[in-house]
């Protein structure tokens, strides 16, 4: 079954067109990586998929239904977004933040139901946060906070998970934690994932396919190795990169001049 079908998608801001005629599909249970340089339209695409923006033209089909036909509450039960910035201004506990993900299921600001608590317990378990349930989010590391945002999204019990730069501002150890968590969720729960990132190195070993955007257009869509083809990447990023084969697939590095 197709989770998403995008047909002729355009979006414009006042200062110009951001997306130009995107066409692609995402199968249920797939991890799709969306990559590209700054201003390629990656985050705009996510905002269109969760309907915080309305496209200028084109169609988005979500699990076989046009996106505008989804009631807001039903959409929030189906699609969850983990934003790039995991900022929480107040010292809510991890449990309280994750419980916020149950709002679309009708709990509101009343007492949580047994179903709410069971969903939160499962989300904490899947993200390895059970031992931190009572800790203030403001006391956590960057990687732990990112996992809290992921757990909150999982508490929504979505069918589609949207991730905006999930490893941004994290050190290598915390990046590995977050990526391993995403891979396990897809593998064990069959969750469909669309991951947006500047970092092409998250694709090998995680993404089933990758979509490369440039200036709002699809430059390449296919297997990760096809998208990380050196000549193609140099056409986008110039000679400032090099591509090397690693144990899990190709890796991209900044090209450093010889000493």
Regions found by a protein language model. Give the residues of each.
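Helix-to-loop junction immediately C-terminal to a conserved catalytic motif
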Residues: 50
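Conserved ABC ATPase "signature" region
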Residues: 99, 114-132
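The feature captures the beta-strand-to-loop junction immediately N-terminal to the Walker
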Residues: 35-37
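Conserved catalytic motifs of ABC-family nucleotide-binding domains
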Residues: 157
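Catalytic Walker B motif of ABC-type/P-loop ATPase nucleotide-binding domains
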Residues: 161-165
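Conserved ABC ATPase signature
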Residues: 136-140, 144
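Conserved ABC transporter NBD signature motif
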Residues: 58-66, 75
């Amino acid at each position: 079954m197709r989770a998403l079908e995008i047909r002729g998608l355009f979006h414009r801001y006042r200062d110009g067109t951001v997306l130009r005629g995107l066409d692609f599909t995402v199968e249920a249970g797939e991890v799709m990586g969306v990559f590209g340089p700054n201003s390629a339209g990656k985050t705009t695409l996510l905002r269109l998929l969760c309907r915080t923006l309305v496209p200028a033209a084109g169609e988005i089909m979500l699990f076989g239904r046009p996106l505008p036909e989804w009631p807001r509450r039903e959409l929030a039960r189906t699609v969850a977004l983990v934003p790039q910035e995991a900022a929480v201004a107040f010292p809510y506990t991890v449990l309280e933040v994750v419980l916020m993900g149950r709002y679309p299921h009708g709990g509101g600001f009343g007492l949580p139901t047994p179903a709410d608590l069971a969903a939160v317990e499962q989300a904490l378990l899947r993200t390895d946060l059970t031992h931190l349930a009572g800790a203030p989010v403001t006391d956590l590391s960057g990687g732990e906070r990112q996992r809290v945002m992921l757990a909150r999204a999982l508490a929504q019990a979505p069918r589609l998970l949207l991730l905006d730069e999930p490893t941004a501002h994290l050190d290598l150890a915390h990046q590995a934690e977050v990526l391993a968590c995403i891979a396990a969720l897809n593998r064990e729960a069959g969750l469909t994932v669309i991951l947006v990132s500047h970092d092409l190195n998250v694709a090998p070993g995680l993404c089933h396919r990758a979509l490369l955007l440039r200036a709002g257009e699809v430059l390449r869509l296919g297997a990760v190795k096809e998208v990380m083809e050196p000549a193609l990447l140099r056409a986008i990023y110039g000679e400032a990169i090099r591509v090397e084969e690693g144990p899990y697939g190709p890796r991209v590095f900044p090209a450093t001049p010889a000493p």
